[in-house]
Amino acid sequence: GSDGLSGITANPVVGAFSDLLISKGGSTVLTEVPEMFGAETQLMNRCEDEVLFEKTVDLINNFKQYFQSHNQTIYENPSPGNKKGGISTLEDKSLGCTQKSGSAPVMDVLSYAEQVKTKGLNLLSAPGNDLVASTALAASGAHIVLFTTGRGTPFASPVPTVKISSNSALANKKSNWIDFNCGVLVEDGTPAELSKNLFDFVIDIASGKKSKSEEAGFHDMAIFKQGVTL
């Protein structure tokens, strides 16, 4: 889960990585829709045209209606772990989530498990649950999942899952989980500079280097079910 440094280190680095990959003709996908609540206008304002703007509005509103139809609020978001790590509100967490999209325009909005067909930044309908969201990314055609964390988790999706730490303490303590440490930004450097190192690392993963979770033999999957998933 996220912590107080996620929106300062790891998420901005992933956002800069996204911009870099898109500038080279690639595609990136942002999901975890409930974690966009409160910061969704940052994405809406970057939609390429009015049609995509309306699709983004529907993406957000449909997920809110999904919760309401089951008589549920967005419970435990931020989660207890998020709060212990320094996140106080949903908006705080959401502003961190949207940073992972960088600054590129939104080029497409995808339904759950819909295949990526457009270069650039895509938004995908899926919940905030780590494994469900990562499985949805894989189902939509993502070759690699970049997962930022300040609290740590050993999980992995069906595709190579690169675990990115927001703080050096986690990277040092769980070196068998964490692939890339963004905690160094607290002492030196910028997200743009570190994103180039992350880009090179992801190229290595795409070329056959195993992520820490692959070395451990972890390949998990979770399907979006009826009922509320945070």
State where each predicted segment sits.
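Anaerobic metallocofactor- and corrinoid-dependent redox/one-carbon enzyme cores
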Residues: G1-L230
